[in-house]
Design a protein with these regions (language model features):
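Short Cys/His-rich "knuckle" micro-motifs
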Residues: 187-194
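Phosphate-binding loop of NTP-binding sites
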Residues: 1-181
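Short cysteine-rich clusters marking metal-coordination/redox-active sites
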Residues: 179-182, 201-204
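Intrinsically disordered, low-complexity regulatory/activation regions of eukaryotic proteins
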Residues: 197-198
Length: 204
């Protein structure tokens, strides 16, 4: 791919390449492709020139190809916005260099244990390597990712209580049953699945 070739010629291509006026990154365990494609569609319908890695090539070579597609042959930016779908594990190799204006996080869940370990590990990767200057758009219903980048500008989104929601964890895997601040058992006003829902700590 163009990204592989560019990285062989210039390993720090992502850091050196010119940036579009608007850069949006989307990461998370699930829903990255859908979310980034929706954002791209909205921007295009608004009349903006946009490039994105629509097919889900979301590690370093794919994101590098995305940058190449945003440039003319002479290296000038030819788009109004670049949208990156970013693999959550590879975010440490991408976010510091593309320097997003906005980072959208869909949520963090258990994935392949061999690859991603625990959601807390992926949390630490994103929290450490996302530039503080990025405006962060977070899933308020997902307890792990909603705590990202506490010192950055943050906006939250979520879905209100639904008729089939529960009040107690019912999955075999429930990663967040205790408060990350004090260790008290969390009380769920409603719970959709895993740890998606509206939780509060009765102690702090």
């Amino acid at each position: 791919t163009p990204g592989v070739i560019a990285l062989k010629i210039c390993p720090d291509f992502l850091a050196q390449a010119p940036k579009a006026p608007l850069t949006i990154c989307v990461t998370g365990t699930n829903g990255k492709t859908t979310c980034s494609n929706l954002i791209t569609d909205v921007l295009e319908k608004d009349g903006r020139r946009v490039v994105s890695n629509r097919t889900g090539s979301n590690i370093v070579p794919g994101c590098t190809t995305n940058v190449i597609n945003s440039l003319t042959f002479t290296g000038k930016v030819r788009v109004d916005a670049t949208v990156f779908e970013v693999d959550e594990r590879a975010s440490r190799l991408i976010l510091p260099y593309v320097k997003p204006d906005y980072l959208v996080v869909t949520g963090l869940f258990r994935d392949s244990l061999k690859r991603n370990a625990h959601p807390d590990y992926i949390f630490s990767v994103i929290d450490t390597y996302c530039p503080d200057s990025a405006k962060v758009i977070l899933n308020a219903d997902e307890l792990c990712s909603s705590m990202l980048k506490k010192d950055s500008y943050r906006v939250f989104y979520g879905i209100g209580k639904q008729p089939d929601d529960k009040t107690e964890p019912y999955n075999l895997i429930a990663d967040y049953q205790i408060c990350p601040n004090c260790g008290e058992k969390l009380k769920y006003n409603y719970l959709r699945y895993h740890h998606i829902g509206d939780a509060a700590c009765p102690k702090c």
